[in-house]
Regions:
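Terminal amphipathic alpha-helical/low-complexity segments used for targeting or macromolecular assembly
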Residues: 1-167, 173, 180, 341-343, ...
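Structural signal for interior beta-strand "rungs" in well-ordered beta-sheet cores
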Residues: 162-347, 351-352
């Protein structure tokens, strides 16, 4: 089949083409089906984020070519159904009961048709019931989403992806999963996320435009617009915000939040830590309760910790600050100045012990 052009007709359903289902707009779902069927998708107006093109320009572009005019926001239309329609040699309509979902044929013939009064000369092609639901309200959006979820999940399982509970797994049509990865119950794989072979994601995990490397474990966590290297473990309850790059064999533990930071190979941030606007090298140990103090109320500053350093529990790193290679920061310190390589820093008050203080207070009736 020769390449064809597709167009959506704006009008009463414009806002429904914009509705998001499984992390994509209705239009984007339809455009993916058109692309898989061998067509090119364009827009008459700003129905969604796609390329804008006027009807006149589209007529010129499609001169002599076949045109698919999508009339209803039926996000569950499949490439197979569109191919079945486009295989017709004559002007045809894809219908579901009295509703016309799409028109097919030469540009002049298609644009001249009134969908509400199709002549008998236009061939009718019946759409599958599960594909013909137009998205017009939350209830229909849910029904369509369920169809898309089943279709997408089944497709990935047939390619060798393990979905422990397909009923609670939602995968964007833009996501890429390698055979041999595993998604546990409650996974939301949104946007252009990728999951490599051997990775185990979930349960109850959100990936949005995230890249998860081979043999990673991401447990009950959220990762957005970030990359996780091979063999790294994340979670439970980690929050990786946009702009993070995590190396291989690293550990991002429970209640750790990362933002706009790089973490080197083999570095361990095991629990209860905030790392923001920072560059951490390789083989660093970050203790419990460490905080990068990166915001002064007006601007944000970066923190650098070089390879093989040790950051003790409850250390505050006041940015901008640089910790040299192989340094040791004792627990409880607030670091405000750069630390040279292989230095030991203790930045806390010396403890004062007052013997028998409690006993004396009790004898005096003050406790």
């Amino acid at each position: 089949m020769d390449r064809f052009y597709a167009l959506t007709r704006v009008g009463a359903h414009a806002e429904h083409f914009q509705r998001e289902i499984l992390s994509c707009t209705v239009f984007r779902h339809m455009a993916l089906a058109v692309e898989a069927a061998g067509g090119a998708a364009y827009l008459e107006s700003d129905v969604c984020e796609g390329e804008r093109i006027t009807l006149e320009a589209f007529r010129s572009l499609a001169d002599g070519a076949q045109v698919l005019l999508l009339l209803a926001p039926a996000a569950a239309l499949s490439a197979e159904t569109l191919i079945r329609l486009a295989d017709r040699p004559e002007t045809s309509a894809l219908v579901a009961g009295p509703n016309v979902l799409a028109l097919w044929g030469g540009a002049d013939a298609v644009f001249a048709l009134d969908p509400g009064a199709l002549p008998d000369s236009v061939a009718r092609v019946q759409a599958l019931p599960i594909e013909s639901i137009p998205v017009t309200d939350p209830e229909s959006a849910y029904a369509v989403q369920e169809q898309l979820r089943r279709r997408i999940n089944l497709g990935w399982m047939q390619k060798g992806v393990f979905l422990v509970d397909p009923n609670t797994t939602h995968i964007s049509p833009l996501a890429v999963l390698e055979p041999g990865c595993t998604l546990l119950p409650g996974c939301l794989i949104y946007g252009e996320s990728t999951v490599a072979a051997g990775a185990v994601v979930g349960p109850n995990t959100l990936l949005k435009n995230a890249r998860v490397g081979e043999n990673c474990t991401v447990n009950s966590s959220q990762i957005t617009d970030s990359t996780v290297g091979s063999g790294t473990t994340v979670g439970p309850f980690a929050y990786i915000r946009p702009g993070c790059v995590i190396g291989s064999g690293a550990r991002i533990g429970d209640f750790v939040e990362l933002k706009n930071s790089s973490v080197g190979d083999g570095t361990k941030i095991s629990h209860l830590t905030y790392i923001g606007d920072s560059d951490l090298g390789r083989r660093i140990n970050v203790g419990c309760g460490v905080v990068t103090v990166n915001y002064d109320g007006k601007r944000k500053y970066r923190t650098t910790v070089e390879d093989d350093s040790f950051v003790g529990c409850n250390v505050n790193l006041v940015s901008p600050v640089k910790i040299g290679r192989g340094s040791y920061l004792a627990a409880g310190g607030t670091i405000t100045e750069d630390v040279p390589e292989e230095a030991f820093v203790i930045a806390r008050s010396r403890a004062t012990v007052k013997r028998d203080w409690v006993k004396k207070r009790k004898e005096a009736g003050k406790l």
